[in-house]
UniProtKB/Swiss-Prot annotation:
GO terms for biological process: cell wall organization; peptidoglycan biosynthetic process; regulation of cell shape. This is D-alanine--D-alanine ligase. GO terms for molecular function: ATP binding; D-alanine-D-alanine ligase activity; metal ion binding. Cell wall formation. It is found in: Cytoplasm. It comes from the Bacteria. Pathway: Cell wall biogenesis; peptidoglycan biosynthesis. Mg(2+) 1 binds at D247, E260. It catalyses: 2 D-alanine + ATP = D-alanyl-D-alanine + ADP + phosphate + H(+). Its EC number is 6.3.2.4. ATP binds at residues 129-180. Mg(2+) 2 binds at E260, N262. Its main location: cytoplasm.
Amino acid sequence: MKNEKIVVLYGGDSPEREVSLKSGKAVLDSLISQGYDAVGVDASGKELVAKLLELKPDKCFVALHGEDGENGRVSALLEMLEIKHTSSSMKSSVITMDKMISKEILMHYRMPTPMAKFLTDKLVAEDEISFPVAVKPSSGGSSIATFKVKSIQELKHAYEEASKYGEVMIEQWVTGKEITVAIVNDEVYSSVWIEPQNEFYDYESKYSGKSIYHSPSGLCEQKELEVRQLAKKAYDLLGCSGHARVDFIYDDRGNFYIMEINSSPGMTDNSLSPKSAAAEGVDFDSFVKRIIEQAQ
């Protein structure tokens, strides 16, 4: 309802702060243009609780990315204050933030996802790894410190960089098309095919504006149905709610591999979730409205 007070949470202190600021501004501008009583709050620093208690919002649109918005702390705070919000629960956010935990759950339920394990100093010193592999922080987003590694020499450098952001995982490299699907509760949107500027969809490819996006993705009807069903099943298995996005690799044999689930996807002009919705005929303002109206 438009007479409800809405706070858009953005910014924060994670490495994805700048992206979050852009997402938050886009969402806030959209809400205000549609007549909502909305204000933005930068979640940086230690004043968030005080700000929320002062503003007393009915709902929060969570446009935080990385640790600040996706590790469960903000969800826990909002749930404690009994404020409806657009992201997943604390428990689900903790799970989806940690790519290894997510993978273990998906593999337990025989969902298609590349094999992975934690990367340690000892493993870096071994030469039994079958290259190429992906090396990335176990927790994090926007493909920050994510590398395609083709040799033991590259592995050492990738490990050093990724370990700056916490525990590091090494993952089987799967070659194929990068596909993503946005979900808002029971609404599963069209798949989007990303042709990255670089060899894979890394940080530069995501935010340079030079990657090519196909929405809809061009999958045949059968494969489109399959990827949507896989996305929704992964979303449900990890206990997601509200707005989330599921990323895949689609190989040349027609197999989909679930790469990760993002519980607080970007909402910038260049972000994938709005493209997924647009392929269904849902423009940005309508998409924002659907997300906030379904806040839980």
